[in-house]
């Protein structure tokens, strides 16, 4: 969970989970079954106090550490979720198991598109990762622009999706972003 604030509004990037500790120690892995451990999410207190100013939630890609907390925390925020078609489908399946079904407004955005989310203009830039449709972002405001990325790798021959394309990132460098 990352936040960007501008002109009285907030933009959330990702809403994931992680695990409290390894599923098993090295010694246990040879002798016992995997142990259960707590799932951990970021503390949403800060943004819960400002939920009326939360313009939207942008999801970078479909891994649990980026979408896993959304079924549990969205009820606090009740704002649109912006992501790609692939991640949206994974998220919809996850939400239907959590009883939210079609209650969450999920807006599908394509690679290279720019979308206004409140005071933020967000551009989706394709990035290589271990699953389809992972993205980095340029977030533009009247105060300036920033580059946001989550997980990525420079991969000329990925197993899924398209090879890494350096061109958009070189253009950002020329724009001093």
Annotated model-derived regions:
Residues 1-58, 63-177:
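His/Asp/Glu-rich metal-coordinating catalytic cores
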């Amino acid at each position: 969970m990352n936040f960007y604030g501008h002109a009285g509004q907030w933009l959330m990037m990702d809403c994931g989970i992680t695990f409290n500790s390894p599923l098993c120690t090295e010694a246990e892995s040879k002798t016992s079954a995997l142990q259960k451990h707590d799932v951990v999410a970021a503390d949403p207190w800060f943004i819960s106090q400002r939920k009326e100013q939360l313009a939207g939630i942008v999801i970078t890609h479909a891994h649990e550490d980026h979408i896993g907390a959304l079924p549990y925390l969205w009820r606090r925020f009740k704002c649109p979720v912006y992501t790609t078609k692939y991640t949206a489908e994974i998220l919809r399946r996850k939400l239907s198991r959590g009883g939210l079904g079609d209650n969450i407004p999920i807006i599908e955005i394509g690679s290279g598109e720019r979308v206004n989310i409140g005071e933020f203009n967000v551009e989706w830039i394709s990035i290589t990762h271990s699953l389809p449709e992972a993205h980095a972002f340029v977030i533009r405001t009247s105060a300036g622009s920033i580059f946001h990325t989550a997980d990525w790798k420079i991969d000329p021959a990925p197993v899924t999706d398209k090879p890494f394309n350096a061109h958009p990132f070189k253009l950002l460098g020329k724009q001093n972003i």
